[in-house]
Amino acid sequence: MNDIKNKIFKLLDKVEIDKVDYNDLENLLKTILSEDLDQESIYAFLDLLHFSNVSKLIADNDSNYWALKISDIIKKYNFHTGQLLFQRAKRYKEKPALITIDGENKKIITYNKLWNDLVLCAKSINSISKDKEIKIGVLSANQYKSALIDLCCLSFGYRVIPIPLNSTSEHLSYILNETEINVLFIGGEKAVQLWNAVQKYHNIKIVDINDIRRIKGNSISWEYFQDLGEKNNNINYELNIPIQDMKWTTTIMYTSGSTSNPKGVKFNQIM
């Protein structure tokens, strides 16, 4: 066991008997930021911060300082969405990650299933688009499949643009043109109506999330989209979670202004 892990486990012993010293905690933080350590050690340190007595200790000293330093850890060790979800899947496996609700029916999505679905989506996206820079649009009511696409993009480094369902057809066209979306996921009746109104002005690959089959233009079903991923064995995605530029724009979210053109707000893995 390396020296840093020894320090973490010694600190954990103190945490469990409520004898943790703030200086020990801060010195460990400084070591993590000054050295290059393995990710498992960093996860072990971050786990310490979940204990209520540690959280109180931080709050009693300088919580703003710690918030900034934890942000530095995220950047230094490239803890983007994909890395964190993969770590959670390895740790929690068959424990619930999400619960979907349809009327009175509830469906539990485990961490393993969520991660496997994300990997399949990434394979499918790479198969459907040969563009150098893949830009994903999501025009859909809230549902598991649209959330899956969003998380997949954040995990594997595709830019994603969620489009408000209350957009006008003019605003939809504006967003499609400005962001240069090359794959658009459409889900729900309202989304289909919006797209069909502007389809003739855009040449975009469409994925019919809910298999509505009334979408105009060149569309494929969700099942066919997943089949593309099943046939794509070029990359082992679990061993090739990409290192991402944490400041690169991962998401552009648009306001749905009633008069002027929608405004895009950019987000990266940090904010």
Q: Where in this protein do the model-derived segments appear?
A:
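Structured binding elements
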Residues: 157
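Conserved ATP-dependent adenylate/AMP-binding module captured primarily in the ANL superfamily
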Residues: 150, 167-197
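Conserved AMP-binding A3 loop
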Residues: 108-112, 250-271
